[in-house]
Amino acid sequence: SQIYVYYKVTAANRAAALAGAKALIARAAADVGVDGALSCRAEDPLTIMEAYGSVHDAPAFMAWLDTAVSSCGLRSLIEGDRHTEHFVPCA
Protein backbone atom coordinates (compact mmCIF):
# COMPACT_ATOMS: atom_id res chain seq x y z
CA SER A 1 0.00 0.00 0.00
CA GLN A 2 0.98 3.65 -0.24
CA ILE A 3 0.78 6.38 2.37
CA TYR A 4 0.49 10.03 1.36
CA VAL A 5 0.89 12.82 3.90
CA TYR A 6 0.38 16.47 3.04
CA TYR A 7 0.49 19.68 5.02
CA LYS A 8 0.96 23.44 4.77
CA VAL A 9 3.92 25.47 5.95
CA THR A 10 4.60 29.19 6.06
CA ALA A 11 7.05 30.82 3.68
CA ALA A 12 9.32 31.50 6.66
CA ASN A 13 9.34 27.80 7.65
CA ARG A 14 9.45 26.28 4.14
CA ALA A 15 13.21 25.63 3.91
CA ALA A 16 13.40 24.14 7.41
CA ALA A 17 10.27 22.04 6.80
CA LEU A 18 11.67 20.67 3.53
CA ALA A 19 14.94 19.79 5.27
CA GLY A 20 13.01 18.12 8.10
CA ALA A 21 10.81 16.18 5.67
CA LYS A 22 13.87 14.98 3.71
CA ALA A 23 15.45 13.81 6.97
CA LEU A 24 12.21 12.06 7.95
CA ILE A 25 12.06 10.22 4.62
CA ALA A 26 15.69 9.11 5.01
CA ARG A 27 14.92 7.96 8.55
CA ALA A 28 11.90 5.95 7.33
CA ALA A 29 14.16 4.09 4.90
CA ALA A 30 16.81 3.45 7.54
CA ASP A 31 14.53 2.62 10.48
CA VAL A 32 11.64 0.70 8.93
CA GLY A 33 12.69 0.02 5.33
CA VAL A 34 10.05 2.21 3.69
CA ASP A 35 11.17 4.43 0.82
CA GLY A 36 9.61 7.82 0.37
CA ALA A 37 9.57 10.84 -1.90
CA LEU A 38 8.91 14.52 -1.32
CA SER A 39 6.80 16.84 -3.51
CA CYS A 40 5.34 20.32 -3.38
CA ARG A 41 1.98 21.27 -4.86
CA ALA A 42 2.52 22.82 -8.31
CA GLU A 43 0.19 25.77 -7.74
CA ASP A 44 1.03 26.19 -4.05
CA PRO A 45 4.67 25.51 -3.06
CA LEU A 46 3.74 25.92 0.62
CA THR A 47 1.86 22.60 0.48
CA ILE A 48 4.27 19.70 0.94
CA MET A 49 3.54 16.02 0.38
CA GLU A 50 5.45 12.99 1.60
CA ALA A 51 4.72 9.80 -0.36
CA TYR A 52 5.69 6.41 1.02
CA GLY A 53 5.45 3.31 -1.17
CA SER A 54 5.47 -0.41 -0.46
CA VAL A 55 4.12 -0.03 3.07
CA HIS A 56 3.36 -3.60 4.20
CA ASP A 57 1.96 -2.81 7.68
CA ALA A 58 0.19 0.54 7.36
CA PRO A 59 -1.01 0.86 10.99
CA ALA A 60 2.49 0.16 12.34
CA PHE A 61 4.11 2.51 9.84
CA MET A 62 1.65 5.33 10.58
CA ALA A 63 2.30 4.92 14.32
CA TRP A 64 6.05 5.05 13.68
CA LEU A 65 5.59 8.09 11.43
CA ASP A 66 3.55 9.97 14.03
CA THR A 67 6.28 9.47 16.63
CA ALA A 68 9.08 10.29 14.19
CA VAL A 69 7.44 13.55 13.04
CA SER A 70 7.30 14.77 16.62
CA SER A 71 10.79 13.64 17.57
CA CYS A 72 12.48 15.20 14.52
CA GLY A 73 10.90 18.62 15.11
CA LEU A 74 8.96 18.72 11.83
CA ARG A 75 5.57 18.96 13.53
CA SER A 76 6.43 22.39 14.98
CA LEU A 77 7.08 23.76 11.47
CA ILE A 78 3.67 22.76 10.08
CA GLU A 79 0.66 25.07 9.92
CA GLY A 80 -2.39 23.10 11.00
CA ASP A 81 -2.64 19.33 10.69
CA ARG A 82 -0.79 16.69 8.72
CA HIS A 83 -3.35 14.96 6.49
CA THR A 84 -2.74 11.27 5.88
CA GLU A 85 -4.22 9.17 3.06
CA HIS A 86 -3.80 5.40 2.73
CA PHE A 87 -4.17 3.83 -0.72
CA VAL A 88 -4.20 0.14 -1.65
CA PRO A 89 -4.14 -1.53 -5.08
CA CYS A 90 -7.63 -1.94 -6.52
CA ALA A 91 -6.89 -3.90 -9.66
Segments (PLM) and residue ranges:
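Short S/T/G/P-rich N-terminal loop/turn motif that feeds into the first structured element of a domain
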Residues: 1-66, 84-91
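Conserved short beta-strand edge segments in small beta-sheet-based binding/regulatory domains
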Residues: 71-87
